Amino acid sequence: MTETLIKIENLHKSFGKNEVLKGINLEIKRGEVVVIIGPSGSGKSTLLRSMNLLEKATKGKVIFEGVDITDKKNDLFAMREKMGMVFQQFNLFPNMTVIENITLSPIKTKGESREVAEKRAQELLEKVGLPDKADAYPQSLSGGQQQRIATARGLAMEPDVLLFDEPTSALDPEMVGEVLAVMQDLAKSGMTMVIVTHEMGFAREVADRVIFMADGVVVEDGTPEQIFEQTQEQRTKDFLRKVL
């Protein structure tokens, strides 16, 4: 049986009086590609950010590789090394070259030698199709290139799972495809991925599972076929009618 990598139990998150997550229960298996869809304000990004504790849950548990990471006794930094994150706005350091951005965490947090870190960074640049950009600065790159660099940076720590928070929504339409192509290659390689996105074609083609969220709850969780073609849930139908 495939190992459960992330287990979420009765997760609640409130900002003041606004309850954004209302008792989420979810399991993510090793090697799965899980895509989370839903209308704006449904809690998708908050759920993703709660998985690696960028947002602290108000109540409930996040269990990662068998360890309750919401328990303050456990080492959050060690866990974060195993959970990569790719943000909507890239979050690259503008005063560092591409290769410095990619090697910063492996050198600083894993204690890797510069030589080892740079060798892997160059391999990752090949993987994301930007082998000649090692010495470039982020501002000289297009949005699509910056997001591919951000993905390479996420992979540099050799994480067990990569979380993507709307990785294409800040991009011009012509750049979306190049980022999705890199993500598709990662999915084929067996990388565990949890992706919040509005790209329904990608969800349909690449996901093992699609989760539809609305109003802070998981409305439906199933295969792409179950969600996109066989849903019996009215809220899912209404959402898909608007976006497809």
Roles of regions detected by a PLM:
Residues 3-224:
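ABC family nucleotide-binding domain
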Residues 214-215, 221, 225-244:
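C-terminal boundary and immediately downstream tail of ABC-type ATPase nucleotide-binding domains
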